């Protein structure tokens, strides 16, 4: 083989510049999303660049969207949804409504306006769009009025008519007149402390078919463990699991999510737990996915009650897990 030709070929393949690497990396993160929308959300800078914090947030939301897409489309295909009867998704603790905007853009706006209707630089055209539009209505629940107002203005600017923003606590969202009697999907991304429990209660009360939770800062259980530490340290060696404050927080977090999964199984949901993103992006990356099957597991309810008793958390049976009724027999 002609080695000079081989060398010449290598020499003509110039290495990628840092700018090219940055562009490819940004395209990989931004994907099919609307660049103008990401700029309006301040995820991208005015120049269309990503900073480290924005990169982390966008990767988290995009990964969640990827995990949601298949079950969401399956749910949409299982019923006769239309413009007059759309699939309803409710996002609790919406904050700046990143998730709601990106979901609506991904499943509705890109199809109704068409990719060709936007400038070539507005989207990553390397990715091919093959999915059909979805009849989707998105409710974003947020307690901070300034965020709700800004999100509503942004939705109006982009013509996202299927998005609604409610300035209300998650625990009160179900009683709002704008809220349908039944919803299809409930999400709560990085839902702090008991917000995940409020989202679960909302989802169950509204007969939600799908629930996606990324819990965060589970302080309630840790506080209860701390309060009963002195009593239980003399009753059971299990109390060593929460004798030290650091272990109390860790155990409280783990135990809370385990009990939430059991609770959902007891109420007729099939539950899976997976990782939202890699550890390098967030330490709070546990994703709980629940799909309603109607098959209530009595064993799950029994084990939930047993755990509450074992760890001195019986009070939660009347608050967070009130739909599980005692006594439970095999």
Question: Where are these predicted regions, by residue range?
Answer:
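Short beta-strand element of Class I
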Residues: 136-139
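Short helix-capping segments at alpha-helix termini
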Residues: 109-114, 129-134, 158-160
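Intrinsic-disorder-associated, low-complexity terminal segments enriched in Asp/Asn/His/Tyr and depleted
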Residues: 124-126
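Conserved SAM-binding loop of SAM-dependent methyltransferases across substrates and taxa
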Residues: 96-111
């Amino acid at each position: 083989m002609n080695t000079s030709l081989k060398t010449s070929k290598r020499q003509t393949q110039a290495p990628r510049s840092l700018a090219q690497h940055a562009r490819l990396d940004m395209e990989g993160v931004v994907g099919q999303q609307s660049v103008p929308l990401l700029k309006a959300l301040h995820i991208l800078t005015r120049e269309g660049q990503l900073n480290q914090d924005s990169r982390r947030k966008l990767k988290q939301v995009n990964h969640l969207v990827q995990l949601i897409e298949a079950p969401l489309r399956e749910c949409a295909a299982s019923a006769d949804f239309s413009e007059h009867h759309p699939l309803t998704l409710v996002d609790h603790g919406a904050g700046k409504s990143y998730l709601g905007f990106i979901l609506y853009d991904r499943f509705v706006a890109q199809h109704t306006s068409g990719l060709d209707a936007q400038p070539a630089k507005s989207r990553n055209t390397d990715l091919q769009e093959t999915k059909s539009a979805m009849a989707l209505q998105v409710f974003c629940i947020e307690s901070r009025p300034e965020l709700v107002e800004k999100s509503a203005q942004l939705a109006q600017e982009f013509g996202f008519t299927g998005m609604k923003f409610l300035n209300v606590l998650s625990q009160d969202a179900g009683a709002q007149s704008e809220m349908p009697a039944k919803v299809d999907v409930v999400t709560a991304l990085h839902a702090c402390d008991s917000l995940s429990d409020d989202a679960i209660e909302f989802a169950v009360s509204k007969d939600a078919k799908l629930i996606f939770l990324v819990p965060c800062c589970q302080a309630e259980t840790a506080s209860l463990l701390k309060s009963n530490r002195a009593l239980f340290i003399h009753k059971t060696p299990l109390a060593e699991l929460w004798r030290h404050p650091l272990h109390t927080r860790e155990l409280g977090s783990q135990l809370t999510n385990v009990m939430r999964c059991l609770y959902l199984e007891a109420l007729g949901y099939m539950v899976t737990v997976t990782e939202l993103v890699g550890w390098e992006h967030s330490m709070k990356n546990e994703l709980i996915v629940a799909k309603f099957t109607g098959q209530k597991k009595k064993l799950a309810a029994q084990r939930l009650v047993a755990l509450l008793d074992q760890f001195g958390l019986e009070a939660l049976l009347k608050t967070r897990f009130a739909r599980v009724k005692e006594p439970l027999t095999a």
